[in-house]
């Protein structure tokens, strides 16, 4: 999430949102190591190549993306990534999953996720997700983001 938020730094980088900061504090308080915006996952928007940088990678191979505002382009991007990388477990943490897709929409972020089989939560990562068994992540398909160091 873009913005001017820069409350604190980790791994030499400032968080870009208050929600990212809150989730990082949750992980730290539980003694869970994480990589912050380290991995760049390639995906293709038809006729053009793009890179997606998820916010967090947990030790068990689950990627976490935090979202306040979740616009149409973000939703399209997540569908493309899921189609092109079905082996990845990418979950969303919303400021509020009850927010509507757009003004006047009958559909909330959470309802949209349920329709598309995307796991999500509000405010913080559910502890059960952090304790799930390790999943294999095909790191050989990805590039690391320049200037960001791996944790641990």
From Swiss-Prot:
Which biological processes are named by the entry's GO terms? DNA integration; viral process
Q: What is its EC number?
A: 3.1.21.2
Q: Which InterPro entries match?
A: Phage_T7_Gp3_endoDNaseI, Restrct_endonuc-II-like
For this protein, the record's Gene3D superfamilies field holds: 3.40.91.30
Annotated catalysed reactions: Endonucleolytic cleavage to 5'-phosphooligonucleotide end-products
Write out the entry's keywords from A to Z.
Answer: Endonuclease, Hydrolase, Nuclease
Q: Which GO terms describe its molecular function?
A: deoxyribonuclease IV (phage-T4-induced) activity
**Presence of keyword Zinc:** no
Record's protein name:
Endodeoxyribonuclease 1
Q: Which organism is this entry from?
A: Enterobacteria phage T3
